[in-house]
Amino acid sequence: MKAIINGKVITVTGQTYDKATVLIENGKIKAVGPDIPVPQDAEVIDATGCWVTPGLIDCHTHICNFSEPGTMPGLSDGNEMSGPIQAQIRALDAVYPDDYAIVPVREAGFTTVYSTPGSGNVIGGTGISIKLRGHTAREMAIAGSEQMKFAFGENPKRNYGNRKQMPMTRMGIAGILRETLFEAKNYSDALKAAETDPSKAPKPDFKLNALVPVVRGEMRCRMHAHRSDDILTAISIAEEFGLDYVIEHCTEGFKIKDFLNEKHVKCVVGPHLTSPSKLEIHNRTMDNPGILSKEPNITVCLTADTGSQTSVLPMTIGFFIRRGLSFEDAIKGVTINAAKVLQLEDRIGSLEPGKDADVAVFDGNPFDSMSLCRLVMIDGEVYKNTL
C-alpha cells in the first residue's frame, strides 16, 4: 500500500483539496480525501507543497509507431501508404516499446497515450491506447481500446495525388470513403443475414471485416480534419453512416463553433508548436481551445500530436490559458475528457476510488513552464520520484 500525503489534490471530476491523501492499494486508488487514515505499513510519499493530479493523457500521438529519431526510415511505421484504404492494419503491430519518446513523455507526467496511425491514407487502420510502461507491446496496450483512423484534407491528397491516383482531390477522399463504408455496410448486413441463413454469407473480405464494428457503431472513428470544410465533410459522412466519431485537430473549429456545439462534437485540438507546414493549418490559433471549451456541448481534448513533443504539452497548455482557456477545462483536456474520447473513463482520467493508480505530482501548477513533474505512478508503481 502507498499513501501520497499533504499535497494539493486535483481529483478533476470531484473536489479539489488543498491538503489531502491519495491511498493506493494493488494498483488501484483506494481512497482520496483530507481525512484518510494512513495504515502504519503503508509506503508514505510526502507531497507537501505539490499538486497531485491524475496521470496525464495525450489521446492523439504517434509514440511507439513513428519512433524517434524520425530521420531513420527503419523507425517510421505509422503510415502504410501502399493504398488509401488500410482498415485492416493495426498500430499495435508497430508499437516499439523502446521508443525514445516514452521516457521524456512519462517524466512530464503522462501515463497513458493513444498511438494512432498517420493521416497519409483515407482509412489508416486502428490505433491503440497504451500505458507508458512495460517491455512488450502487449504489456503496454490496453486491450479493447482500438479506434479507426480516417483522414481528410491535404495529407491523403498529397500522398496519392503525386502518384496520379485516387484520391487526388477532396472530392476523391469523400468519394472513396463513402464507397468503402457503403461496401462495409452491405458486408455487415450480409453477415447478419448469414446468422440465420448461412447461404447469405458474403465472400470473406479482410478489409471490410475490419470495418464491420465501425459501421455498426461499435468502434469509434478518429477523423483527421483541420479545415472547417473538411470538418463538415467528416461530420456529414459520420451522420450518413451512423458512425461514432471524434474530430482530430479541429484546427478551424472556432469558425464553426455553433455547429459543432449543436452536434455535441468531441474534438482533439492540436498540435500548436509546429511550423505551419501545410496551407490547411495557416489559420491555426492558440485561441481555439478556449473558444471551443466555452461551448457547453463540445468536448475538448488537447494534444501535441507527435512523439516526444508531448513532454512540452503542459507548457503549451499554459499558452492556451493565457489566451482564454480556463484551468478547469485545461486539466480536463489532458485527463477526463481524453479518457472519455478513449472510452476509458471508467479506468483513468481522474482520482477516484476504484480507478487505476495513475498519478502525477508537480511542484507547482502543471501548466506553469517553471513547474516540474516530480513523481509519476502507473498502476501503483513509481516510475519517477524526485520529491
Regions from the PLM with identified roles:
Residues 69-95, 136, 151-159, 201, ...:
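Active-site gating loops and adjacent loop-to-helix segments of metal-dependent hydrolytic enzymes
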